[in-house]
Amino acid sequence: MEKFGMNFGGGPSKKDLLETIETQKKQLLQYQARLKDVVRAYKSLLKEKEALEASIKVLSVSHEADVGLSGVQPPGLTFPDSVDDRCSTHSEDSTGTATSLDTAASLTSVKGEFGVEDDRAARGPLPPKSEEASGSESGVSSSSGDGPSAGSEMDKRVHQLKTQLATLTSSLATVTQEKSRMEASYLADKKKMKQDLEDANKKAEEERGRLEGDLKVLQEQIAETKARLITQQHDRAQEQSDHALMLRELQKLLQEERTQRQDLELRLEETREALAGRAYAADQVEGFELQTKQLTREVEELKGELQTIRDEKNRPDPRLQELQQEAARLKSHFQAQLQQEMRKTALAEDQLRQQSQVEEQRVAALESQISEVSELLGTYEKAKQKDQLAIQKLKERLLQLDLENKTLALAASSRSSLDIHGDESSLDINVLKDKMEKLKKLLQVAARKSQVTLDVEKLCDPEIMANSEAADGEKATALYYQQELKQLKEEFERYKMRAQVVLKSKNTKDGSLGKELEAAQEQLAELKDKYISLRLSCEELESQHQQEAEDWKQELARLQQLHRQELERSQLDFRDRTLKLEEELHKQRDRALAVLAEKDLELEQLRSVALSSGLPGRRSPVGGVGGGGLGDPADTASSDSLTQALQLAAANEPTFFLYAEQLARKEVEITSLRKQKHRLEVEAHQLQERLLEEGERHREEVGALQSHIEKNMRDQSREGANLEYLKNIIYRFLTLPDSLGRQQTLTAILTILHFSPEEKQVLMRLPSGGSWWPSGKR
């Protein structure tokens, strides 16, 4: 109530006190249950502690007994005692580390057997006499005189070990029992908590359904109250038309001028920024389009040249075609994905915009309903003040009637005293005169209060009485006065009946007014509760829709991030593949250059061989002439083949180098084209990102402008109701004497004015506003 400014003074109500008492009772029951659990756990821990102390005590006693026996033992029984010590050591270790009785017994027996066998193996083969002496108990008893005492000590030792084992098993059983009980209690508590959780969920579902039904009923009641309030507003508008119209027109003009000026400034700045950004983007887009067109022309020319080269060579590179096809396929795939993501984002933005519009309409409807309920509360406050004035008037009337009843009671008491003493003093004329004077005064008072015209002067005129006394003194007898008293009694009875009727009517009227006041108070409390519940539901819905909008935005950002990551991944894959292909082309070119170098070397060798062989060939005719003119046919055939090979090599040499140069030029052009293609793709992606950013910013600006326009329309539609509600709240704020009421009324003003944080800070800095501002809002 205090949060929404509905409690205009006073302490906590009876309902709040009962709720606090119930919560304290629940807390006491919880604390009692926790205390019982703590006591139970403490008792179980005490049992475990006692069991562990008993086991520790037994172990310490066994250790002391072992020490005592080892100190008193004779030298002839060294080996059995060592065996027993080992067995006891093994049993103590096993019982100290085991988790149950069976494992402890098994470990003890196994370790004892292993100890005896190890001792026997370590002792080795004994001589026959020693084996016979130590083989049986009779031999030991006949050979040594201390045999019976050692046997009794061994029996005591065995009995002591058995008792220790029994105590250890009992302590272990108690510990396991406590652990199992704790585990069972833990499982029971877990089951109970699950059941409580299910019950709480069921209760929450039922409460949610009930609240939805209550919300529907409240909406219907709000519609009814809205219709009633409209009629009341029409009635009140006729009464306060002049002042309200003047104030409304002035405030409307001022607000419209301010809003128009602010809107024009904001729109001017936004349009300037938008025009500058669009002009810059348009210039960039035109420049990029020109660059892309130029590059596409160059690419087409280069493609034509490549096609001519391929046609000349008639050996197209299949890997380059596959690369281009794959690049085109990836480009189309990415464009399709981009268009699909853009459609998804546009659809999500449309859904968010529609949902935000619906939520704003609902919030506006709820705010109008809240303003109407606040106006209804103002009317109820006025009716309450009127009822209080009527109650005050009725209280004054009741006090007046109480005074009349008191006077009537005094008159009745005086009349009874007159009746009692009438017989005794009826014969005295002076006494009767005094009584008549008193009765006359009482009659005058009663006549004034009951507004009955009685001619008291004529009845009790002293001149008439004096004349009657002088004329006929004998007629002043008891009968005359008794008749007058009878008349007075009748008049008194009539007045008494009238007073009773008045009292009855007053009581019935007070009862009806009290019932009406109680009904009005109950209705006011119900309306306050409904207002609070509606406000809370409105806030919950608003927070829920804000959360949904944030989730949508996060999902959109996530999808965009995934798309960008996939795009970058595909670009990286494409770059890796292009780099690999470029490396292969470079390797192929290196191999071609190496082959060309080898061919050059071979040609040089052939030329050198041809030159060396050509010199004797030229000299052969001289020798032939000197030698008789005969030559070798094999030498002539070899020289002819060499000259033909040289001629072929010389003829094919320019074409081979031209082919190598063309291959190198083609590789250089391909690498440059790939670089240009990569650069163009990067620029295209950057342009797409910029266009997307520009589109998002434009959509945000359009949404902000639409929300601002809708807010202005809502403000204009709700201006009359808000001004009326604000007038009532400010009137209440100015008429309240206490600071607590002022703070609560100020919180009610906040529900309609919606101060910004900067305005709140300015108000808090002021010395006068800081005292009015509530501590919870700072």
UniProtKB/Swiss-Prot annotation:
<feature type="compositionally biased region" description="Low complexity">
    <location>
        <begin position="133"/>
        <end position="152"/>
    </location>
</feature>
<protein>
    <recommendedName>
        <fullName>GRIP and coiled-coil domain-containing protein 1</fullName>
    </recommendedName>
</protein>
<dbReference type="Pfam" id="PF01465">
    <property type="entry name" value="GRIP"/>
</dbReference>
<keyword id="KW-0963">Cytoplasm</keyword>
<keyword id="KW-0472">Membrane</keyword>
<feature type="coiled-coil region">
    <location>
        <begin position="13"/>
        <end position="61"/>
    </location>
</feature>
<feature type="coiled-coil region">
    <location>
        <begin position="152"/>
        <end position="702"/>
    </location>
</feature>
<feature type="region of interest" description="Disordered">
    <location>
        <begin position="70"/>
        <end position="157"/>
    </location>
</feature>
<comment type="function">
    <text>Probably involved in maintaining Golgi structure.</text>
</comment>
<feature type="compositionally biased region" description="Low complexity">
    <location>
        <begin position="94"/>
        <end position="109"/>
    </location>
</feature>
<dbReference type="InterPro" id="IPR000237">
    <property type="entry name" value="GRIP_dom"/>
</dbReference>
<keyword id="KW-0333">Golgi apparatus</keyword>
<keyword id="KW-0175">Coiled coil</keyword>
<dbReference type="GO" id="GO:0000139">
    <property type="term" value="C:Golgi membrane"/>
</dbReference>
<feature type="region of interest" description="Disordered">
    <location>
        <begin position="617"/>
        <end position="638"/>
    </location>
</feature>
<feature type="compositionally biased region" description="Basic and acidic residues">
    <location>
        <begin position="83"/>
        <end position="93"/>
    </location>
</feature>
<feature type="domain" description="GRIP">
    <location>
        <begin position="716"/>
        <end position="766"/>
    </location>
</feature>
<dbReference type="InterPro" id="IPR051952">
    <property type="entry name" value="Golgi-autophagy_related"/>
</dbReference>
<feature type="region of interest" description="Disordered">
    <location>
        <begin position="186"/>
        <end position="208"/>
    </location>
</feature>
